[in-house]
């Protein structure tokens, strides 16, 4: 759940940044409804229960209602949606409007079977992409902590040039407080 909350809180901080751009013709304080965060879990048995607890704390998941068979047919996935007004940081502390967090529209897709990453991408583009018809899609792996303005800069690349079909951000290792993460050889390399 720490990796999930690290990523989700980073996304929430980015949505707050979009809404802080008061001189923007696209964004501003009421810009948050233009963003939908889709979380796809690859297999009900594979997702960690504490991650589900974090999603429940955000209001987008309810434990105990998902069934694997309905009307004698196997269920492929369970879809939940909610507009949350709080975020959970890495320390599992709630952050809300008092900390600059704005509402966030969320879709949580809990796939019944673990079908791997490409299948999750297909779910995102074929199911949710067709329904939402987004102008820009940004894919993040769990554990990635986007800087507070990173998603804005990715969006801006698409907004400024209609010929841009893809963009990538820079990935940096989190060195931790006092750069203690550098004691880990994987981080240090």
From Swiss-Prot:
Disulfide bonds: none annotated. GO terms for cellular component: cell septum; plasma membrane. GO terms for biological process: cell wall organization; chitin biosynthetic process. Keywords: Cell membrane, Cell wall biogenesis/degradation, Glycosyltransferase, Membrane, Transferase, Transmembrane. It catalyses: [(1->4)-N-acetyl-beta-D-glucosaminyl](n) + UDP-N-acetyl-alpha-D-glucosamine = [(1->4)-N-acetyl-beta-D-glucosaminyl](n+1) + UDP + H(+). It is a multi-pass membrane protein. GO terms for molecular function: chitin synthase activity. The keyword Cell wall biogenesis/degradation applies. Its EC number is 2.4.1.16. InterPro entries: Chitin_synth, Chitin_synth_fun. Pfam families: Chitin_synth_1. Belongs to the chitin synthase family. Class II subfamily. Polymerizes chitin, a structural polymer of the cell wall and septum, by transferring the sugar moiety of UDP-GlcNAc to the non-reducing end of the growing chitin polymer. This is Chitin synthase 2. The lineage of its organism: Eukaryota, Fungi, Dikarya, Ascomycota, Pezizomycotina.
């Amino acid at each position: 759940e720490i990796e999930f909350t690290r990523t989700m809180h980073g996304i929430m901080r980015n949505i707050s940044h979009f809404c802080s751009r008061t001189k923007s013709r696209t964004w501003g304080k009421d810009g948050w409804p233009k963003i939908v965060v889709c979380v796809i879990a690859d297999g009900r048995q594979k997702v960690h229960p504490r991650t589900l607890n974090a999603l429940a704390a955000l209001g987008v998941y309810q434990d105990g209602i998902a069934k694997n068979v309905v009307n004698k047919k196997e269920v492929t996935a369970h879809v939940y949606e909610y507009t949350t007004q709080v975020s959970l940081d890495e320390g599992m502390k709630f952050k809300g409007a008092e900390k600059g967090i704005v509402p966030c529209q969320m879709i949580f897709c809990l796939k019944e079977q673990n079908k791997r990453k490409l299948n999750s991408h297909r779910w995102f583009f074929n199911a949710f992409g067709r329904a939402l018809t987004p102008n820009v899609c940004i894919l993040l792996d769990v554990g990635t902590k986007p800087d507070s303005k990173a998603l804005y800069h990715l969006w801006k690349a698409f907004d400024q040039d209609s010929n841009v079909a893809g963009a990538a951000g820079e990935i940096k290792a989190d060195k931790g407080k006092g750069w203690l993460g550098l004691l880990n050889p994987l981080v240090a390399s």
